[in-house]
Amino acid sequence: MHTALRSILIVTKSGHREAEALGERMRAWLAARGLSARVVENTGDAVSLAVAGQECSLALVLGGDGTILGVARRLLGSGVPLLGVNLGKVGFLAEVAATRWESSLERLLSGGVTVQERLALSFRVERDGATVHSGGAVNDVVINRGILARVINLDLRVGSERLGELRADGLIVSTPTGATGYSVSARGPLVHPQLHVYTVTPICPFLNNLLPLVLPGEARLSVTVRDRTNEVYLTQDGQEGYALQAGDVVHVERAPGGMLFATIEELSYYRKLKAKGFIKDQA
């Protein structure tokens, strides 16, 4: 879908002078063309970011994939589309190269913004019948072991149906957006970002008793921690962690509203896979 630009929120990587300077140049460039723009630093405060984004029609995020992930997670359900400007190394989530930002914004102003709705995940940790922790994820929800090199025991259910017990280093529940992250390193599948599915991929499973699964977006996954001797942690997007206990049940499902990514279609998904080395053409 397309959306008209009214005002723009520019979010810069925390403590990054290049991002701050570029943000100010963008603000001045947009103001000269009659658009309202505000520059804020990504401090990690979800409330202040949500308030800043209430009246904007687009969020420009200046940084690497980590910065884009953090901002996208805090904007879940806000209805504000996000467009990444790459100042990092990989930049798979970024649509715009920092060296070509002016021409990219010109395209935005001339044609409007094309917005893609992508699946995101919500999760909650149930302990003794009560919810003790909850949150959302743009890339993945990971359950894994602590510092000791031991497998952990997890029990998996999809809806009311039990899949079985998994003995592994951990488990990755990934969105299509996160399929090119931790999941693919664990031999999870590449998934087109516009598909409304999510994947379940074991990390080094003992005896390979569970292959990667692709679940429909409507499915609800429940993971029970059976391990009583090892440290087990839940992490969201590789950025925020939470210690789990034996008997905890992690419920994962599709987040309402999902997340919105703006695109100017400079590089198709398949060309991006090739450019980032996920597909190698031998011809």
UniProtKB/Swiss-Prot annotation:
Family: Belongs to the NAD kinase family.
Positions of NAD(+) binding: D65, G66, N139, D140, R150, R167, D169, T180, G181, Y182, S183, V184, S185, Q239
Record organism: Nitratidesulfovibrio vulgaris (strain DSM 19637 / Miyazaki F)
A cellular component term, taken from the record's GO annotations: cytoplasm
Record-linked Gene3D superfamilies: Probable inorganic polyphosphate/atp-NAD kinase, domain 1, Probable inorganic polyphosphate/atp-NAD kinase, domain 2
The protein's name: NAD kinase
Keyword NADP recorded: yes
Gene expressing this chain: nadK
Compartment(s): Cytoplasm
Cofactor dependence: a divalent metal cation
Listed InterPro entries: ATP-NAD_kinase_N, ATP-NAD_kinase_PpnK-typ_C, NAD/diacylglycerol_kinase_sf, NADK
Catalytic activity: NAD(+) + ATP = ADP + NADP(+) + H(+)
